[in-house]
Amino acid sequence: MTVLLFGFEPFLEYKENPSQLIAEALNGSTILKEEVKGVILPVEYEKIEDLIVTKIREMKPILTLGIGVAPGRAKITPEKIAINYKYSREGDNAGKKYKGEKIDPLGQDGIFTNIPVEDLVDLLNENGIPAELSLSAGSYLCNNAMYIIIREARKYNSLGGFIHVPLHESYAARIQRPIPSMSLDTMIRGIRLSMEFILTNKKENLTFS
């Protein structure tokens, strides 16, 4: 069994992406006897679905967790729901934009994660890691990835979800405007703790509605 951890490459003005750094840092580690496989996703609508579907089919992980950066957020924010919707004012790394199309024309309008995100938020805060629940993963690549992750995890009766993180401090310090941030070490600890918590409680979470 494995844990599949997706991060994203840099995009738009953000020349470093903490989700990539977290996935790389945790790649090859072991959490509760499960090996973590970190995979970096391109910020391209036309590529991420095939990559996510292929990796989940190949690895059949017990948990697939996506991570993305949410510039402007100050806390780690586990996401509750992914919506079947693509909209972007800015293009992806290939210049592609969408104006309200569905991710999956045959899919549900929204899919809830089967990760206990409410309890996860409490756990992170209790361990000194600022966290809050998010009810919107947006409409850009993170929401797109989350929708596919949850959809595919259902096929294997496994766990799937998504967590947004702030910008990391070392990069935020180089941006010429005020912006919330968090230390990379704290975010790595937060994601590791999240995976431990999810795996510990996995039996209660393997139900879908």
Curated annotation (Swiss-Prot):
GO terms for molecular function: pyroglutamyl-peptidase activity. Disulfide bonds: none annotated. Coiled coil: none annotated. InterPro entries: Peptidase_C15, Peptidase_C15-like, Peptidase_C15-like_sf, PGP-I_bact-type, PGPEP1_Cys_AS, PGPEP1_Glu_AS. Its EC number is 3.4.19.3. The keyword Protease applies. Keywords: Cytoplasm, Hydrolase, Protease, Thiol protease. It is an enzyme of class 3 (hydrolase). The active site is at residues 79, 142, 164. Transmembrane segments: none annotated. One of its GO terms (biological process) is proteolysis. It comes from the Archaea. It is found in: Cytoplasm. It catalyses: Release of an N-terminal pyroglutamyl group from a polypeptide, the second amino acid generally not being Pro. Homotetramer. Removes 5-oxoproline from various penultimate amino acid residues except L-proline. Belongs to the peptidase C15 family. PANTHER family: PROTEASE FAMILY C15 PYROGLUTAMYL-PEPTIDASE I-RELATED (PTHR23402), PYROGLUTAMYL-PEPTIDASE I (PTHR23402:SF1). This is Pyrrolidone-carboxylate peptidase. It comes from Saccharolobus islandicus (strain Y.G.57.14 / Yellowstone #1) (Sulfolobus islandicus). The lineage of its organism: Archaea, Thermoproteota, Thermoprotei, Sulfolobales, Sulfolobaceae. The gene is pcp.
